[in-house]
Regions:
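Extracellular "spike/adhesin" assembly and maturation modules
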Residues: 1-129, 133, 137, 268-270, ...
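Long, acidic (Asp/Glu-rich), low-complexity accessory segments flanking structured domains
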Residues: 172-186, 260, 280
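Solvent-exposed, flexible loop/coil segments flanking beta-strands in beta-rich domains
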Residues: 110-175
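Terminal (often C-terminal
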Residues: 127, 188, 192-194
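Extended, charged low-complexity segments
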Residues: 195-329
Length: 329
């Protein structure tokens, strides 16, 4: 690249910044990109033909797009003013340095969108479960579906987060107390992000599978497993056991996988009681009232929602509106 103070701005210089420099260029982050790079914005920069003139308008678009990317991420870059038509285009310092910084921080997001809570189906088991000291399992399945594999990529690349949470407050059996403690106190909220490294999103740190709250120490917490690490077969990303005898065999577990050729995230949550709690105790639990949105009833419930990326500095919500379908068995 010939781009330097006192030199002429050539088409190859501009094209490198816009789309041809490996890794650190505008279009790989702003446009379709590949894998964990790309916000899916349609307003990418056109290249200039070899030997062509780079106009002030084109240069301004480049400067403004770098600013938008950095602002979306919260990346600090060099302050610069976009040129205007009719003025001499001066060489601006540290353009490639700033692009490299933005590429390194491509998974970060300074803000977040509003929580989506309009899941469909059933997320709570309102009838009682178990009989005496017999083993039982409640299975909650949540399927998040995007319109395309690219839409799913854009969601995670731009800072989208999947949120998992559970609750149970119903009473009436000996086992209810410990199950309520497990679901409401020991288990925290679980967030699933892209997972290719640590992302700073809306001021929080996320690594793929991130636990927020909850006093329990899980036997499994796949901290570095996120969307890009999942397979089409189940991976256990979280498992928390109860902590009070004789119920320490009870647990809540989350398995995650992709489906639909990269268009779906499937979370299968199991509440498991192995039975055999012994004399003076029981393994059956109460049902209760149903959950709606993120307003929990009293029944055993597992809810999956999401926070889409912020569009404050982007031009479009390229990830669309993913749906969340819930079942319980």
């Amino acid at each position: 690249m010939t781009y330097s103070l006192g030199g002429l701005i050539q088409a190859t210089d501009y094209n490198g910044f816009a789309s041809t420099t490996a890794g650190g260029n505008v279009n790989i982050m702003w446009g379709t990109g590949t894998s964990d790079a790309g916000y899916g914005q349609s307003t990418t920069l056109a290249t200039v033909s070899a030997g062509g003139t780079v106009t002030a308008t084109q240069w301004a678009s480049l400067v403004n797009r770098i600013s938008s990317i950095a602002s979306h991420q919260g990346t600090t870059i060099t302050a610069r003013t976009a040129p205007t038509a009719g003025t001499v285009i001066a060489v601006l310092s540290a353009v490639q340095t700033d692009l490299n910084s933005c590429y390194t921080n491509r998974g970060n997001a300074a803000g977040t969108g509003s929580q989506y809570t309009s899941w469909t189906g059933t997320s709570s088991k309102t009838t009682a479960t178990g009989s005496g000291s017999t083993a039982w399992t409640i299975t909650f399945t949540h399927t998040i579906t995007w319109a395309s594999a690219n839409a799913a990529r854009y969601f995670f690349n731009a800072g989208g987060r999947i949120k998992w949470e559970c609750s149970k407050t119903s009473t009436g059996t000996l086992a209810d107390t410990e199950w309520n403690d497990l679901a409401n106190t020991l288990v925290g909220d679980i967030y699933i992000t892209g997972g290719t490294g640590t992302q700073t999103i809306n001021g929080g740190s996320y690594t793929g599978t991130t636990k927020s709250g909850g006093t329990g120490t899980p036997t499994t917490l796949a901290t570095t497993t996120g969307w890009y690490d999942l397979l089409t077969t189940d991976t256990t990303i979280y498992k928390q056991f109860a902590d009070t005898s004789p119920y320490t065999g009870q647990y809540i577990q989350i398995n995650a996988k992709t489906a639909g050729t990269g268009t779906q995230l499937v979370l299968t949550t199991t509440w498991v009681d192995p039975g055999g709690s012994g004399a003076g105790s029981s393994d059956n639990i109460s049902g209760g009232t149903a959950t709606s949105g993120i307003s929990f009833g009293t029944a055993p419930a597992t809810v999956v929602t999401y926070f889409p990326p912020s569009t404050t500095y982007l031009t479009e919500a390229s990830w669309g509106t993913p749906t969340v379908a819930a079942t319980v068995a």
